[in-house]
From Swiss-Prot:
It comes from Rattus norvegicus. It is found in: Cytoplasm; Cell membrane; Nucleus; Membrane, Clathrin-coated pit. Sequence repeats lie at residues 274-276, 294-296, 306-308, 319-321, 332-334, 349-351, 367-369, 377-379, 501-503, 517-519, 571-573. This is Epsin-1. Residues 453-467, 556-569 have a biased composition (Pro residues).
């Protein structure tokens, strides 16, 4: 006896199982072989007993609930149930139909042993066959009738063989039980044949399967409709997004084209802005038939007023490279004095050439940036000067000269500069009118030129400054002095020449210097010790004092030559 058999017997005694329950436990054991046909036949005969029937069915349902490693309990329980449905009481098939859901759950039975073999496939196939048999009433009836006939044939064969042996008929239980191994083998072959026939027959779908199929189809249809609606919504949103993107792209392209068109259109003429704060010009309407504006041409608006007070220039022509038309004389604040007009007298230039009587068509005014001429006179002396006296200067009438009788005593001034390059410091023209004592216009002009600062702005009616010459310093009595003899070395007097100096004493010789000079200053007084101490520069003994007297208020003469030995004294007024 095996260990499993001993264990089952111990459990049967402990749990106090009945005879029917013990047979069911034996038929559905965990042994590796199947239940015997004789044991199943005995259990089928016990199903006709009401008490035994309940015990048998409760034990079968308990075995069907096992799982995992007890997969043989489940498989053998379904095999016994199938045999009882075909050969047992009709109450077995009825109770199985009522509890069909327990058999349907076994369609998903899963178990894989240690060797990796799927043992649950046997349980799943057996559950499908049993469910198909319970749902098909006609097949169940045919299978039941065929099993009962086979059972009767087996019983009759067993009865005939037993009658030959014994006189009395065997009991009913003995007829069902196989009497020999050959009969048991025959029953097993019959059961296998019936199982094959059932497996070959196609499973028929019951009403529940149809309902489930319809339900599954409806669910699938609803899912499909839902997915279709979602897909259509996505397509619609995608189409709307594409259209919106196309509209935005079209708008951007249109704006880009408009910007490009604006670039090539004619821009409005800009308003001229004066950097010196001049008034802005009023723009005028451009006529339709006007020509296109030249980008290199003159501005369309009139030029603003000159902030320096100059005359307004005439509008330039449209071509900026065409030479400008001759216009009126422009006032140059840094240039010389412009030439007078034809109807006006020549204006006296205090630092220019003394050519008052020159015609209007004389040489132009000196350019401050042009190279200096060969002859340079810091006091404005001209190389050629007219010797006329009493003429009108600058268009003003002269007063009658009361010393005109002394004109015969004057000598003609040299017509050209000295050949030795001496500066004609006292050369000049005697003006007809002496300047006022408080006239400082010449001093201002001289200071402006000496410092180098720009002259003030031109006044509406400037007073023409008069030139400061030795004649203007001496006044009307300038004709009484021979200026040439004062600044030049006296030459030899020709014999027989008549003396023209009215200040010489009578009876004095015509040649030779005078004995006494009325213009010689008195000798300097001797300074005391306190005066010498307070004096910043002590006087040099034997040297005459230096007197600086500016002529006409002009600046002192700068040194024109490097210092050297002092020139010999040629002043006739000094001893």
């Amino acid at each position: 006896m095996s260990t499993s058999s001993l264990r089952r017997q111990m459990k049967n005694i402990v749990h106090n199982y009945s005879e029917a329950e013990i047979k069911v436990r034996e038929a559905t054991s965990n042994d590796p072989w199947g239940p015997s046909s004789s044991l199943m036949s005995e259990i089928a005969d016990l199903t006709y007993n009401v008490v035994a029937f309940s015990e048998i069915m409760s034990m079968i349902w308990k075995r069907l609930n096992d799982h995992g490693k007890n997969w043989r309990h489940v498989y053998k329980a379904m095999t016994l149930m199938e045999y009882l449905i075909k050969t047992g009481s009709e109450r077995v098939s009825q109770q199985c139909k009522e509890n069909m859901y327990a058999v349907q759950t076994l369609k998903d039975f899963q178990y894989v042993d240690r060797d990796g073999k799927d043992q649950g496939v046997n349980v799943r196939e057996k559950a499908k066959q049993l469910v198909a048999l319970l749902r098909d009433e006609d097949r169940l009836r045919e299978e039941r009738a065929h099993a009962l006939k086979t059972k009767e044939k087996l019983a009759q064969t067993a009865t005939a063989s037993s009658a030959a042996v014994g006189s009395g008929p065997p009991p009913e239980a003995e007829q069902a039980w196989p009497q020999s191994s050959g009969e048991e083998e025959l029953q097993l072959q019959l059961a296998l044949a019936m199982s094959k026939e059932e497996a070959d027959q196609p499973p028929s779908c019951g009403p529940e399967d149809d309902v489930q199929l319809q339900l599954a189809l409806s669910l699938s249809r609803e899912e499909h409709d839902k997915e279709e609606r979602i897909r259509r919504g996505d397509d619609l949103r995608l189409q709307m997004a594409i259209e919106e993107s196309k509209r935005e792209t079209g708008g951007k392209e249109e704006s880009s084209l408009m910007d490009l068109a604006d670039v090539f259109t004619t821009p409005a003429p800009p308003q001229a802005s004066d950097p010196w704060g001049g008034p802005a010009s009023v723009p005028t309407a451009v006529p339709v038939a006007a020509a296109a504006s030249d980008p290199w041409g003159a501005p369309a608006v009139p030029p603003a007023a000159d902030p320096w007070g100059g005359a307004a220039p005439t509008p330039a022509s449209g071509d900026p490279w065409r030479p400008a038309a001759p216009t009126g004389p422009s006032v140059d604040p840094w240039g010389g004095t412009p030439a007078p007009a034809a109807g006006e007298g020549p204006t006296s230039d205090p630092w220019g050439s003394a050519d008052g009587g020159a015609p209007v068509s004389g040489p132009p005014s000196s350019d401050p940036w042009a190279p200096a001429p060969a002859f340079s006179d810091p006091w404005g002396g001209s190389p050629a000067k007219p010797s006329s006296n009493g003429t009108a200067v600058g268009g003003f009438d002269t007063e009658p000269d009361e010393f005109s009788d002394f004109d015969r005593l004057r000598t003609a001034l040299p017509t050209s500069g000295s050949s030795t390059g001496e500066l004609e410091l006292l050369a000049g023209e005697v003006p007809a009118r002496s300047p006022g004592a408080f006239d400082m216009s010449g001093v201002g002009g001289s200071l402006a030129e000496s410092v180098g600062s720009p002259p003030p702005a031109a006044t509406p009616t400037p007073t023409p400054p008069t030139r400061k010459t030795p004649e203007s310093f001496l006044g009307p009595n300038a004709a009484l002095v021979d200026l040439d003899s004062l600044v030049s070395r006296p030459g030899p007097t020709p014999p027989g020449a008549k003396a023209s100096n009215p200040f010489l004493p009578s009876g004095a010789p015509a040649t030779g210097p005078s004995v006494t000079n009325p213009f010689q200053p008195a000798p300097p007084a001797t300074l005391t010790l306190n005066q010498l101490r307070l004096s910043p520069v002590p006087p040099v003994p034997g040297a005459p004092p230096t007197y600086i007297s500016p002529l006409g208020g002009g600046p002192g003469l700068p040194p024109m030559m490097p210092p050297g030995p002092p020139a010999p004294n040629t002043n006739p007024f000094l001893l």
